[in-house]
């Protein structure tokens, strides 16, 4: 598989998560949706693994795979959704998410001996700046007051949970470089989604989530989430982590908010201004520097 093709496909798929979350919001509570999505992907890839006779890891390794999935998807998405529901503005959550590639790059130095050259760190800085430019209009309107009050209104515990979600996906990304990397991708994705499903179930029970209103939009969003987000995108991301540096792989996430802004413009008629387009260009330049610096 070409690394460039895998990177492009991953970004295109992963960015749709923002759109799916918005589309299914009126029809299902977030963790119920995530439980169905993770469980569906786990079942799908278990069937694929069995049909293709993929080698399953030893039972003693299953716990590691479950933990990897719980960190990479379960805690990350469940905690971030909860933080937004508690009053943390979505734009602030997205800005916190932009720090994840930076955290991964910093931690990859002592853990794996990965070292980004100066151009790579410059690319990371550009990536964060690009995301900030893309999100700037949403953080400032309808008036900076609303967003500022939303951020200020979020409790310290809510902010802590949001930071925990970013720490979770960072840990999950780095953990993919450990012993779990030896497991066949098909069985790894099945087990890791099972781990994420356990977390989503715990969140749904703890928060008393019960809302599920069957609708074509919900079923379409669930099918896309099963096959393309927790399936295809995770396969590509784990492959990129296994076959390259953790910092270079996670730097691709800088492009998710800009692409989501484009998708919001096409699908929902959201405003897309010159500042956001400039942010897209800056983020793209940053990812190019981070990924292909030597």
Segments (PLM) and residue ranges:
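Glycine-/small-residue-enriched transmembrane alpha-helix faces in small-molecule transporters
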Residues: 1-35, 41, 142-178, 198-199
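Cytoplasmic-side transmembrane-helix entry/capping segments in multi-pass membrane proteins
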Residues: 7, 60-69, 116-129, 183-193
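Helix-helix packing/entry segments at the starts of transmembrane helices
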Residues: 11, 34-36, 92-99, 174-198, ...
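Specific transmembrane alpha-helical segments of multi-pass solute transporters/efflux pumps
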Residues: 13, 17-18, 46-97, 133, ...
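Membrane-interface helix termini and inter-helical loops of multi-pass transporters
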Residues: 19-28, 82-86, 135-154, 205-222, ...
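Transmembrane alpha-helices of multi-pass small-molecule transport proteins
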Residues: 26-75, 101-103, 107-108, 167-172, ...
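C-terminal transmembrane-helix exit sites in multi-pass transporters
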Residues: 44-56, 84, 100-125, 258-278
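Hydrophobic transmembrane alpha-helices of multi-pass small-molecule transport proteins
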Residues: 45, 107, 116-139, 147, ...
């Amino acid at each position: 598989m070409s690394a460039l093709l895998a990177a492009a496909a991953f970004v295109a798929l992963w960015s749709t998560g923002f759109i799916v979350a918005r589309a299914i919001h009126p029809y299902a509570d977030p963790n119920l949706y995530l439980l169905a999505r993770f469980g569906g992907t786990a079942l799908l890839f278990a069937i694929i693994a069995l049909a293709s006779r993929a080698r399953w890891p030893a039972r003693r390794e299953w716990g590691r795979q479950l933990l990897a999935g719980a960190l990479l998807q379960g805690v990350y998405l469940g905690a971030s959704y909860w933080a937004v529901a508690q009053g943390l503005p979505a734009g602030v959550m997205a800005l916190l998410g932009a720090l994840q590639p930076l955290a991964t790059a910093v931690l990859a130095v002592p853990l794996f001996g990965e070292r980004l050259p100066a151009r790579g760190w410059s690319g990371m800085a550009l990536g964060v700046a690009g995301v900030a430019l893309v999100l700037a209009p949403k953080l400032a309107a309808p008036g900076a007051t609303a967003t500022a009050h939303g951020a200020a209104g979020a409790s310290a515990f809510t902010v802590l949970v949001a930071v925990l979600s970013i720490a979770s996906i960072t840990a999950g990304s780095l953990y993919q470089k450990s012993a779990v990397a030896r497991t066949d991708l098909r069985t790894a994705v099945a087990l890791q989604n099972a781990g994420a499903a356990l977390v989503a179930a715990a969140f749904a029970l703890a928060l008393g989530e019960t809302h599920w209103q069957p609708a074509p939009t919900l079923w379409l969003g669930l099918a896309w989430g099963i096959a393309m987000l927790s399936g295809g995108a995770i396969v590509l991301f784990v492959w990129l982590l296994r076959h390259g540096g953790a910092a270079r792989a996670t730097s691709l996430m800088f492009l998710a908010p800009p692409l989501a802004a484009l998708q919001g413009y096409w699908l929902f008629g959201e405003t897309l201004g010159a500042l956001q387009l400039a942010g897209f260009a800056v983020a793209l330049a940053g990812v190019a520097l981070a990924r292909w610096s030597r």
